[in-house]
């Protein structure tokens, strides 16, 4: 999958959200899958989950985002 960079949710398609911490579009399903397969963490908000999932699991990008 192509990583989609974003500044806000409007830059993302298909109902994806923009994760502010690393500016990458992500689906809720992808986030839930990450959590389910790896860890379960308490989330204060959905955005917490997105940031966590991206940084720890889904997008370990070679250029150090």
Swiss-Prot record:
Localization annotation: Secreted
MF-aspect GO terms: metalloendopeptidase inhibitor activity
Name of the protein: Carboxypeptidase A inhibitor
InterPro entries: ACI44, CPA_Inhibitor_I44
Function, as annotated: Inhibits carboxypeptidase A.
S-adenosyl-L-methionine in keyword set: no
Superkingdom of origin organism: Eukaryota
Record keywords: Metalloenzyme inhibitor, Metalloprotease inhibitor, Protease inhibitor, Secreted
Homology family: Belongs to the protease inhibitor I44 family.
Keyword Secreted appears in the UniProt entry: yes
First-listed, main subcellular location of the protein, grouped into a coarse class: secreted
Organism: Ascaris suum
CC terms in the record's Gene Ontology section: extracellular region
